[in-house]
């Protein structure tokens, strides 16, 4: 009788402790991609072939409170042989007021900015030696996945916007503030999205400022994007423009192409151009093959940031196998 009473008391206590506890929805997803890269360059150190791998596991938890708030937690873990670090880890609180994100995650520039290379699935970025020129039309990440606070307004019609702030520390002076917006509308059967973002990282001398503005038009299976970006900091005044297009075919294949150009007004003559084509093919659900071919050309300026900077041009070919779970 005493054992039964103790067991009943334990069960009642456990029930009381868990009655007010929320039961979270949990999801686990993973994505991995393997690539073969072949580069033909007039710089010997850049010429040759390499393998690449990029894998990630995401754990997501979500809970809806009695008051109507949605509380979420996400952690993304890199899962490559040489990289097993936590990439992002943040908590979110969402409701009628919008969404608040706290922790290590992207700044709002990544949420709202539109770049020309968004039209394709895989972007090859042939780097050039000791050059600080832009290689795409995206906003500069600046604070990356550093610990920050971000706020996103609730959607109002087709308009959304947000702001984020990353604190550099008690004695730091390199805080990063970012703002971004999207506006989507329908016109003549087309879906048009205008997106932009701006970010500033403070400094004791010259701040670093970056902006992006892009427009995306979706008409049936056809997508077109045009974008521009800028980056201003010590000894840099870089502007980049580009355009991209993709078309979804009936057989599951997606064709894409893009072009971009970047110039630094403070290094006269410094210029980077890149154009590429892409073919995506869905082999099976969750398995995709992507082929990219990119041509690039980098011209050095008359006032280079480094004496080691050299001109470079060539072709980058890439085969990527992507799997998602």
Please provide the spans of the model-predicted regions.
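Outer-membrane beta-barrel proteins
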Residues: 1-325
């Amino acid at each position: 009788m005493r054992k039964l009473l103790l067991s009943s008391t334990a069960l009642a206590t456990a029930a009381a402790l868990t009655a007010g506890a929320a039961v979270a929805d949990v999801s686990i997803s993973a994505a991995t991609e393997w690539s073969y890269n072949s580069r033909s360059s007039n710089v010997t150190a850049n010429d040759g072939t390499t393998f690449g791998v990029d894998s990630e596991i995401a754990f997501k938890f979500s809970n809806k409170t009695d008051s109507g708030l949605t509380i979420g937690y996400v952690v993304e873990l890199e899962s490559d042989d040489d990289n097993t670090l936590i990439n992002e880890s943040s908590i979110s609180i969402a409701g009628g007021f919008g969404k608040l994100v706290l922790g290590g995650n992207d700044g709002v520039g990544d949420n709202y900015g539109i770049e020309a290379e968004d039209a394709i699935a895989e972007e090859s970025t042939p780097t050039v030696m000791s050059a600080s020129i832009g290689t795409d039309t995206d906003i500069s990440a600046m604070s990356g996945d550093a610990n920050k606070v971000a706020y996103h307004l609730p959607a109002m019609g087709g308009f959304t916007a947000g702001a984020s702030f990353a604190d550099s520390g008690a004695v730091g002076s390199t805080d990063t503030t970012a703002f971004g917006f999207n506006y989507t509308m329908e016109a003549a059967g087309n879906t048009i999205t205008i997106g932009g973002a701006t970010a500033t990282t403070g400094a004791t001398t010259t701040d670093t400022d970056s902006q992006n503005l892009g427009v995306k038009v979706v008409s049936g299976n056809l997508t077109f994007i045009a974008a521009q970006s800028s980056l201003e900091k010590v000894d840099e005044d870089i502007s980049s423009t580009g355009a991209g297009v993709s078309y979804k075919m009936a057989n599951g294949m997606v064709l894409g192409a893009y072009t971009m150009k970047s110039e630094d007004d403070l290094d006269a003559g410094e210029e980077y151009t890149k154009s590429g084509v892409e073919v995506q093919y869905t082999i099976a659900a969750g398995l995709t093959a992507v082929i990219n071919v990119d041509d690039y050309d980098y011209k050095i300026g008359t006032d280079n940031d480094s004496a080691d900077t050299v001109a470079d041009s060539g072709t980058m070919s890439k085969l990527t196998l992507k799997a998602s779970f």
